[in-house]
Amino acid sequence: MNRKKSLAAVLLLCTVFGFTACGTKEQTKNGVTTKKVDKQAATDISNVHLRDKKSLYDKDHTKVTTMYLTVRRGDATENQNHSWSEVNQYSVEDYQKMHVKRYQVAGLLQVGNEDGPVSGELGYDQDVPNASVQIRGESSSKNAQKNYKIKIKKNKGEWNGQRTINLNKHQTEALRFRNKLSYDLMEEIPQLMGARTSFVHLYVKDETSDNPSGKFEDYGLYTQVEQINKNYLKDHGLDENANLYKPNFFEFFRYEDTIVKEDDPKFDKDKFEKHFGNQR
């Protein structure tokens, strides 16, 4: 009786689980016996969704980082033999008229608090420049208060995993924080890639003038925005070897014969890159 009950139980299990566990999916072909398994259908690339790496973002959106920037004349071969006054004097349009690259200076960037640089932070107890500094932006470069791009040299450290520090002043934006707010909101939107941002209180000591004061001048509040580059792709879990394009002109025209996928017969790389500059 027990044997009959056991056999009945086995038959019942085979029925419930579709005979999978009982080997009924085995098949023999050319003398080879295999057990067939169920496979998930391949995912169409059109159905793949972007997913940002949310763990990158600091949840304290009101925190302010204090930075100290000492600027000096650098090497002429690196376009850094200029004064701080010259760097802040010209707009992008001026540089285009002069047919020269944007002027730079050598910089020592240090991170700390309102009392000064802090031990363990970038640039602490250093005296040799660790970065280059130039203005950034296009139309905003005409403003009296400039935006700055600070590029930390290789092997000279980094800040929050970043070697390019973009400081935006937003002089023409009355509230001064809408750019930061927009990035904070983007963090919560699915399938939309964001960028790390932070408020920065910047102090600058100019050692390029004829009569340097030797003191740090308060430049006020800036928004630091993560540079979209190869490191960005890697840090956000994307393909760091992918092509990364930046629009040359921010506009909303479709250009259907030019802005197409690479496998489209109409794709012309030269025409495409008139609208988008390759950032790699």
Predicted features and spans:
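Phosphate/dinucleotide-binding and metal-coordinating scaffold of catalytic cores
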Residues: 22-280
